[in-house]
Amino acid sequence: MDHIRNFSIIAHIDHGKSTLADRIIQRCGGLSDREMEAQVLDSMDIERERGITIKAQTAALQYKARDGQVYNLNLIDTPGHVDFSYEVSRSLSACEGALLVVDASQGVEAQTVANCYTALDLGVTVVPVLNKMDLPNADPDNAKAEIEDVIGIDADDAIPCSAKTGMGIDEILEAVIARMPPPKGNPDGPPRAMIVDSWFDNYVGVVMLVRVVDGTLGKGERIRMMATNSVYPIEHLGVFTPKSENREALKAGEVGFIICGIKELQAAKVGDTVTLEKKLPNNAGPAAEALPGFKEIQPQVFAGLYPTEASEYDQLRDALEKLKLNDSSLRYEPEVSQALGFGFRCGFLGLLHMEIVQERLEREFDQDLITTAPSVVYEVQLNGGDVIEVENPSKMPEVGKIAEIREPIVTVHLYMPQDYVGPVMTLANQKRGVQLNMAYHGRQVMLTYEMPLAEIVLDFFDKLKSVSRGYASMDYEFKEYRASDVVKVDILINGDRVDALSIIVHRAQSQYRGRAVAAKMREQIPRQMYDVAIQAAIGANIIARENIKALRKNVLAKCYGGDISRKRKLLEKQKAGKKRMKQIGSVEVPQEAFLAILQVED
């Protein structure tokens, strides 16, 4: 076990993490030059396009060090985005060390810090690396100072490298061997392995990526998942050298994959512990307790997804089921809306996660979707003392029954160059943020705010990027539920409530948002043969109204001169017809109208 090193790479988006992983794989001969391609570990199209890593991937590499020994290096590539922080913490807990990659021209950014703290909390050894040293504007001294200031680890011996040109790769590998500890664990005890990630393969079922902590798992043994208590036989196991390579057994300290022909991903939960089913003469028996750190992930953001054609509901359900195979943190349940028909209420980890799920549904499964405005989970205390959780505005009880509503509050860390502090603070205050702290680290400023999650969900991230010209970065973590004066604003069209357009907002903004949504609807809904009234209401109080004028035919065109009563008769007849139409007519709300709410400015 002394010759094994498990490490991962922590970096902010675009700091060159995946490119560095490519270079390390190339240097260790994991793939021949013919098979090498850019960002080898980011296998989904969407990962490539957005330049982000979503699922954790691994590579088991052989490296011959300068001391002549051959070491087994297991590189575990982690996602960098705050939405996937649970996957990051699983990947990191499977490692003993991490390379902290910082772009020498940009310095430390928010997600680097968040993930680095996770690593330090888990007791992982962090080795700083300064990437992109080949750029003319690289400033290594400033980057080192920021690492020491912001993260508080010693950066004197940070390794300069350039993943693009391949400079400094050997130094990094030597540092991995010299500075990171070998894995701990009992190679002869009852086997325990942690599931770092799992995904669904069309041919073999669920593939589990595991880090074996104690003991040995062999082909053909029956294993038990400790969180779900289900038992499966091992059909194949092996390692990825990015390509998959079958082995007979995985030993303590190794990272590899196990395939058991499992049909549904729910059985293999990320973070769960795998052990043997029962004691047999030739094995060490099942483990007594699971590895620490497993938790069920709770979605933070909810939105409705509906097919554009009612007939495609079944396809959407299939698509969601398949996507869920690869994404255990996605939750969904069927719901019916009067306006949109049958669809699903989906729960996501955060906004990026939501966008990615939508995009994968559209791209990989060819679905046309309508998405309702994202909302968060509110705790509602009723007059009787019961507390219910409401994640869908249309499920909010009537005003008279509610004692208080509590909304989720998050702590937000914002990092930006000091030139942008003013605009960012203005934005945070508009979003009901309460400033907790402000710290200067060299040229960077870190602001800490408490904010309602509901305010972040809509468009905070986009606005933050625009007021700071893309320089600010953020991450957030859930803090608590806190009582707040929020109300549900209903949108009525000709007196009928359209449930998919309901929004929950703070009372101070309710008038403004109600007016803005009504105005938006007026632009989107086509003119009918009769007047259409669009109203925004809180309970029974109407707070805003817009009218769409009727289309009318000029019934007087054929009258020349003559008596006024003749004209009046024709106008009255038209009016009576319009009134009759209005009683039986229903207004079609077009798809665009539902999307338009998402773009309502504050």
From Swiss-Prot:
Residues 2-184 form the tr-type G domain. GTP binds at D14, H15, G16, K17, S18, T19, N131, K132, M133, D134. Pfam families: EFG_C, GTP_EFTU, GTP_EFTU_D2, LepA_C. Its main location: membrane. The keyword Protein biosynthesis applies. Its EC number is 3.6.5.n1. Keywords: Cell inner membrane, Cell membrane, GTP-binding, Hydrolase, Membrane, Nucleotide-binding, Protein biosynthesis. GO terms for cellular component: plasma membrane. It is found in: Cell inner membrane. HAMAP family: LepA. Required for accurate and efficient protein synthesis under certain stress conditions. May act as a fidelity factor of the translation reaction, by catalyzing a one-codon backward translocation of tRNAs on improperly translocated ribosomes. Back-translocation proceeds from a post-translocation (POST) complex to a pre-translocation (PRE) complex, thus giving elongation factor G a second chance to translocate the tRNAs correctly. Binds to ribosomes in a GTP-dependent manner. Belongs to the TRAFAC class translation factor GTPase superfamily. Classic translation factor GTPase family. LepA subfamily. This is Elongation factor 4. The lineage of its organism: Bacteria, Pseudomonadati, Pseudomonadota, Betaproteobacteria, Burkholderiales.
